UniProtKB/Swiss-Prot annotation:
Residues 80-297 form the Radical SAM core domain. Gene3D superfamilies: Aldolase class I. It holds the Pfam family LIAS_N. PROSITE patterns: RADICAL_SAM (PS51918). Belongs to the radical SAM superfamily. Lipoyl synthase family. One of its GO terms (molecular function) is metal ion binding. The keyword Cell division does not apply. This is Lipoyl synthase. Binds 2 [4Fe-4S] clusters per subunit. One cluster is coordinated with 3 cysteines and an exchangeable S-adenosyl-L-methionine.
Amino acid sequence: MSKPIQMERGVKYRDADKMALIPVKTVMTERTEILRKPEWMKIKLPADSSRIQGIKSAMRKNGLHSVCEEASCPNLAECFNHGTATFMILGAICTRRCPFCDVAHGRPMAPDTNEPVKLAQTIKDMALRYVVITSVDRDDLRDGGAQHFADCISAIREKNPSIKIETLVPDFRGRMDRALEILTATPPDVFNHNLENVPRVYRQVRPGANYEWSLKLLEKFKEAHPDIPTKSGLMVGLGETNEEILDVMRDLRRHGVTMLTLGQYLQPSRHHLPVQRYVSPQEFDEMKEEALAMGFTHAACGPFVRSSYHADLQAKGEEVK
């Protein structure tokens, strides 16, 4: 039996190095079929990238991270060019190693106690009115990072009194009650936690997570704050069927979730899970109709939709696809 790899704190493991640490492996070979992207998946880059560079510079200046960059989001150019970003707190190294995700794995450093203040000032400088705060998984922390979320929310509101805050939280595995006790004392305006995909493929797609646990997290927050919207998102193209997606949507409604995002999974590198199908815009439209019929008040469904894609418009109920 081989010895476990001793990871050095603060070192990022990506691509092949990260995938080598995953117990349930998908082995990619030269014979593995790579699906060609359909026309509707082609992205047009903005002609002027000055705003993009400005946001990147503001992030670097204050030692902050965006999930847009760390997870290689396909919407980065569009969102940055519109002056929006999803901030990723608690560092850029995740204690999980999901094979669909491009965020680095490893042993993260201790949380930056100055991050809440730096984040609040950056948001004020950018004159944002709606902000999404997410994080890597921090299984190394006793509260999973919940107190750091609360500190960030408080600091942001102190400097930006009229801002709306959406949190996209991890599952707080083994720490749910402790985390919820902290977060219910300093709640966001929207509470988001992604299920990512259907339970049948969880062991391969989301190792270390539990489908029922994630549903319970969403339900418990909603019970504590019935007036605050809860939200969840899924990726399609990882081996699930449309009927399985509909079943997950029904589960979300049974657990009080009212906001939904559905988007196409895209393979970050050849080392990550391959795309098994591309879902057409028409199918996404049909899923949105099903979601609204189930009672979701907001449903953003489309090939490029991501959990925080135009989150401000999603929260207003405007169409996003």
